[in-house]
Amino acid sequence: MFNKLVALATVMPVFLYAGDAAIGGNPSALWYIVSGTCVPEQGTQAAQRTCVQVDISQGLDRGFAVLKDNAKAKPFEYLLIPTRRIAGIEDPRLADPSTPNYFEDAWEARRFIGTSLGANPQWDMVALAINSMQDRSQDQFHIHIDCVRADVRTKLKENDQTFGAQWTQLDLPPPNHPYAVFRLVEDSLANTNPFQLVSQRLPGAAGHMGLMTIAVVGATFPNGQNGFYLLASKASSSMDAHGEDLIDPDCHVVGR
């Protein structure tokens, strides 16, 4: 099976990956790239040729890879992808305390945005997002790592005093999509797993995680302390749940 994955990966042009657009319509494309190319490259001269980072120091079941999205429309975006098979946000293992906190790893990987930009974006200029089951076309879990939209950043800042350790409803562009917002006053995600927080503490999420989208946006509070805004929204028959919409692939927020 492993050799089969390697063979499949060699015929898949990595550079065609564009967000949730599947390569050649293949919803397993990301999985084949990571398992068939990025992981085997480790320990060889080709290391980091395909993925900019692969961490399997704790084994494949707890590892992850970071892949540059090379779509022309996403010049600064990266994707964090587990090195084990996880389809997406609906997988109950993501809320299990024994599962790695992939959002923590994705936040640490924000440094790669700076590599592409030529300058590190400020803490509160970065956003992470995972789309709902119905609003993705790749069936391998991945977190988008990019800049937050400037208008989203502004609205979160303007409403900061209304947020707390309970979920608060807020409409965010584009265009006035309803999100539940949780204010996290910690400068690390080490002690907070967004999947657990949403599935266990957001009303209506438990048992329906496949309909959810989750985003994490860096926050710098009025007192200067860094933290996070955790955002979640639920898909319905009339509304998608595509947290990636909160991202600005052109990174205008950094003054480009």
For every predicted segment, state its role.
Residues 19-256:
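HIT superfamily nucleotide-processing domains
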Residues 1-4:
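Positively charged n-region of N-terminal signal peptides that target proteins for export
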Residues 6-17:
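Bacterial N-terminal signal peptides
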